[in-house]
Amino acid sequence: MLTEIPETIQTPAKPQSIWKIFVVFLLGALCFLVTQILTRVPLLGWLEKQTKFLLWAMSYPLFTGILIAMSAGISEESGRFAFKSLAIKPTKSQFWEPVVFGLGHGLCEAVWLLSPIWAMAGLLEPGQIVLAVVERLIAIAMHIGFSVMVWNGFQLDQRLRYLFLTILAHGLVNALIPLAGKFGLG
């Protein structure tokens, strides 16, 4: 059941060394860099140069938008899963770990996406900047939540189930963007 809280999360956390917290934070940021900047974004860039893909995307814009949204969920959540499996031990962990990992992931994404906005801040209305920052704060909270979901799969020994559910949740959240555009809400 998704509402179960694993025993290891219920126990009070032992004081963690700043170093371990910092490493988990950096691994979260690295996960974003690997799954998005070094992998998904270049693949999407290559794909949009393909004539057949462009024709297909223009024929089915909403479906294409939803598929691209789902690709973010697949990419990022598979990355979280791989980092937890390969780089962050033990399998059972304290609650702070996915929170710090998600914070690293989300802040790295925020810096990457907000940097161009800061570069042209003088040209924007204050409300536009506030809106961008609020959107990123919500996204950071979502990244923390997605990390907790993936980690719960490890805690409950239901890794693939939780990976699938997290990919689905992430994809559905991202699919709201093309859906909002389709209905004039974007």
Regions found by a protein language model. Give the residues of each.
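Hydrophobic alpha-helical segments at protein termini of multi-pass membrane proteins
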Residues: 1-186
